[in-house]
Amino acid sequence: MSIKLGYLFKLPSYKTSSISPEVIVDLEKFLNLCEGSCSQCNTPFCVDVGPRNAIIQLPNGADVLNLNPNFQAIFECCSKNSLTGVQIFGMYNDGTYELRSFCPVHGVNEDPANGSGAGSVGVFFALNNPSIISSDFAHLLFNQGKILGRNALIRVAIKLSANGLYDIHVGGGSKICISGTAEI
């Protein structure tokens, strides 16, 4: 078995849109959070990279791990608001992040390693912290999947491109579990 490290893909172009205050309150309720919790750090908004995700930042990684989501209610909220899922993250004291990805609309209550979701969080981070991002890559490290017993480390690299938008690269380690060819 071999392990490959590195950036696996560059996120495609992205679009952002706001989330109504009513939907934010609903998401707080469905995540079993106190009202106002989702806006403590930054106002949540949607990032669309193909999948359209609501992005929420909590004050710390432990808050993210302690979430007790109501998946049926999240499913209904996402369906009603054309969301693929909800990405929730928080920073630890060591500068790494905890990320949880809820996508019940697609039959995945919680994804242990969601690259497009982590990339969407990278967009959210860059737009909320423009002074940190330059033409050199800023790096974020996300822990994901702990609650599911499937620990993953996802790396997100962000840089400001010449056109004023952010280039987001997502990757991490992977194990080749099977190899071969397929004929179509």
Swiss-Prot record:
One Gene Ontology term, aspect cellular component: cytoplasm
InterPro entries found in the cross-reference section: Phenazine_PhzF-like
EC id: 5.1.-.-
Main location: cytoplasm
Isomerase keyword on record: yes
Pfam family, one: PhzC-PhzF
Key word ATP-binding present: no
UniProt protein name: Uncharacterized isomerase C186.06
Molecular-function GO terms, alphabetical: isomerase activity
Keywords from the named record: Cytoplasm, Isomerase, Nucleus
